[in-house]
């Protein structure tokens, strides 16, 4: 059966679009990287900050870089829901060994509220000593985040250099994906500024929203409702046995 070329871009909490190409059968890892780079480049102007492939024959979603992505997982849930005509869907994703259970609530033609449950997701939190700021490594397996509690340095050259320095210092260069997530506490709320590098496709984005970064911030602070750079909320729950992630989603191109 030939691979299709159905493509959509789906945003999470008004940002961080995921470009998804629906294919019938899996690719090699090298092909995921090659085609994923092209897909990402072709859809960046449409709001995509990452790209992946929905393998319809295997109920699987694979990121171009093989990493785990929380926003892309919920974007994939929207696509699986549309393809199956079902509100509740289960599937697997790259960077996570368990099963994703998703509930997709359609609000309008292009708008949805999506909740994903990742049963068995391991969330390791490891304090980093020797810095003025409070820093924790949060390891989700398919992506690792360095959570820095300080004001976000808005200048691109500064946050790029900080990301590079922490990635080297903490020996994270060989991980599939590395995020540095600045968190700012405002009264009882927490806002994040996520900067994410994906090794195999060498992409680097100050993401306009970040699902896995939300999980990391929740794990460190205990706060569930995390304010994204868009000003919108993504909600996370980190339990000993599972992680949940939920927010508004919107199909911005198909």
Q: Residues of each region from the PLM?
A:
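A glycine-rich beta-to-alpha transition motif near the start of alpha/beta enzyme domains, typified by
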Residues: 1-113, 122-130, 146-254
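Internal, conserved structured core segments that host functional sites
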Residues: 116-118
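Short, cationic low-complexity segments
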Residues: 132-144
């Amino acid at each position: 059966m030939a691979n299709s070329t159905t493509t959509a871009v789906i945003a999470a909490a008004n940002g961080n679009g995921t470009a998804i190409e629906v294919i019938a059968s899996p690719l090699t890892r090298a092909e995921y990287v090659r085609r994923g780079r092209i897909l990402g480049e072709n859809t960046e102007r449409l709001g995509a900050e990452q790209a992946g492939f929905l393998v319809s024959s295997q109920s699987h979603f694979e990121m171009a870089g093989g990493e785990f992505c929380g926003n892309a997982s919920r974007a994939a849930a929207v696509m699986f829901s549309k393809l199956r005509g079902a509100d509740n869907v289960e599937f697997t994703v790259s960077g996570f060994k368990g099963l994703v259970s998703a509930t997709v609530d359609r609000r309008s033609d292009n708008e949805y509220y999506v909740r994903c449950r990742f049963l068995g997701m391991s969330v390791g939190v490891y304090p980093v000593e020797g810095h003025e700021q409070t820093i924790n490594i949060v390891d989700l397996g398919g992506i690792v985040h360095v959570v820095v509690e300080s004001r976000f340095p808005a200048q691109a050259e500064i946050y790029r250099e900080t990301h590079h320095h922490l990635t080297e210092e903490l020996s994270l260069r060989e991980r599939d994906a590395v995020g540095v997530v600045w968190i700012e506490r405002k009264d009882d709320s927490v806002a994040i500024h996520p900067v994410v590098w994906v090794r195999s496709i060498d992409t680097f984005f100050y993401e306009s929203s970040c699902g896995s970064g939300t999980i990391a911030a929740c794990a460190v602070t205990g706060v569930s409702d995390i304010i994204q750079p868009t000003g919108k909320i993504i909600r996370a729950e980190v339990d000993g046995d599972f992680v949940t992630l939920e927010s508004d989603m919107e199909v911005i191109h198909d």
